Amino acid sequence: MGYNAGSYDVIVIGAGHAGCEAGLAAARMGSKTLMLTINLDMVAFMPCNPSVGGPAKGIVVREIDALGGEMGRNIDKTHIQMRMLNTGKGPAVRALRAQADKFSYQHELKKTIEETPNLTLFQGMVERLIVEDGECKGVITQAGAEYTAKTVVITTGTFLRGEIIMGDLKYSSGPNNQQPSITLSEHLEELGFDLVRFKTGTPPRVNSNTIDYSKTEIQPGDDKPRAFSFETTKFIMDQIPCWLTYTSTETHRLIDENLHRSAMYSGMIKGTGPRYCPSIEDKVVRFNDKPRHQIFLEPEGRNTQEVYVQGLSTSLPEDVQRDMLRTIPGLENVEMMRTGYAIEYDAIVPTQLWPTLETKKIKNLYTAGQINGTSGYEEAAGQGLMAGINAACRSLGKKEVILGREDAYIGVLIDDLVTKGTNEPYRLLTSRAEYRLLLRHDNADLRLTEIGREIGLITEERYERFTNKKLQIEQEKERLSSIIIKPRPEVQELIRNIGGSELKDGIRASDLLRRPEMTYEHIHLLVPSEVELSDEVKEQVEIQIKYEGYIEKSLQQVERMKKMENKKIPVDIDYDAISSLASEARQKLKDVRPLSMGQASRISGVNPADISILLVYIEQGKIARVSNQ
């Protein structure tokens, strides 16, 4: 027998990385919010890699922070190591990566949630949604509690009909042997949602005391203080190294001999796995010309002996995993503490979502994270933040927020999902962003802080610091553009020392900085600023001046694209009435229901001829609309 358990503005189902961001954002925006999760001890749990960031993903964490989200602040307080990646490359692909103390990460984020006003955290399993007249009105739990809400956000991760697989062993489970969610998945199918079956995996964990680190290569963190959050002022300098080793020919032989026992190759696994995070079996088979593969040994925290064996994701049986580990240099006598496994789960086809992450089938229902077909904590957190923001906006009667591809990697991620869909777990890559020179690690605050403030997630104090930083950047750029550096002896000597060509005439300081061998610090030696500038301001000045031409070119591309984005398509347009559209294009347009000509042009199967026909049709005002009957 059910009972009325309360009424909320926003209900979030799940408390993983998507759910935490969704719940915190909604509550901080002023919505009365409830977070429901199967197990309170698993809030913000890291079931796979104990790390945050990396190429593209690290930029997403910066974007989450710039908008007022929590992931960046939380990892800054709880990491054991931090490194800037791709420092030898251009600014567009640089990214920060932190090794997490996964237990501290969980503890700190749960504490933040518990202390946040407007936010209630409760342990309970949601089995059904309350849906009336095509609108979501709340949820019903396994215990019969009925919670009503203006909006609901589903962030169930890999729990929907989750199954763990190792060799020929297969059983119903969420990650890390947690209770899976079976009934909710079945209920979503009843409501008419198309679901797909995806798979991901995790490697074994081993005991640090049984590793011979002398046979591995140390991978220390950066000496320079690093942080994801623009608010962080206290840095953790007591870092713990990771270690690099490699598989051996014996490892590969053992895998080859036992491929028939791998769930990946025996037919036990039906779900599609992540292309960019293959299992060790997959790597050995697909890249059989390579004599070895990298293995990183990553501590799971400061107060545990568990070490994550990065690069050894597997669905081989337990006995093979133990033998395989002991063929790796440094792990000859290792003790395995947890086995690796594959996990299959249900995800919804993401083209069933609007760019706000609201479902098209049911109003006021949003989804975020791995349920949308993505992989990765960062991708989940970015979606969770946007779903939470938009659910709160709907509940408060405010305009919803959609980030464009030119605004953020989060915008690229969501647009790819809702426009193109995905037939495998989606991972964000820098190559997916056509405006990646604009979407850098260093300028996330310049891109998104204004939006964060408008929606109420950025404090006035933080906004004031941001505007001061912006002003200092502009003033320093103007100063360098107005100063002429003459070919004095000390100038020529500095240029010679760094391998540059001597000056023939005077040159603007900004033009001298554009030379590839020149840095801001070199210019500062020649024409020092009277104002003390932070490293972040100096970095912005250098990048904006050095790459000005390329940035300008990208901005022109954005303006051309915006013309297409500004050509809106009515939501209720009847594509069947446009007889000259190709049949494939018509079906894809009906499935995705793009909101603009720009979005329509990115749908696979819709070619330029179809776009031209659609454009003419709309501009002539011949809009046949689908009947609401």
From Swiss-Prot:
GO terms for cellular component: cytosol. FAD binds at G14, A15, G16, H17, A18, G19, V126, S181, Q370. The keyword Ribonucleoprotein does not apply. InterPro entries: FAD/NAD-bd_sf, GIDA_C_N, MnmG, MnmG-rel, MnmG-rel_CS, MnmG_C, MnmG_C_subdom, MnmG_C_subdom_sf. Keywords: Cytoplasm, FAD, Flavoprotein, NAD, tRNA processing. GO terms for molecular function: flavin adenine dinucleotide binding. Its cofactor is FAD. GO terms for biological process: tRNA methylation; tRNA wobble uridine modification. NAD-binding protein involved in the addition of a carboxymethylaminomethyl (cmnm) group at the wobble position (U34) of certain tRNAs, forming tRNA-cmnm(5)s(2)U34. This is tRNA uridine 5-carboxymethylaminomethyl modification enzyme MnmG. It comes from Bacillus cereus (strain ZK / E33L).
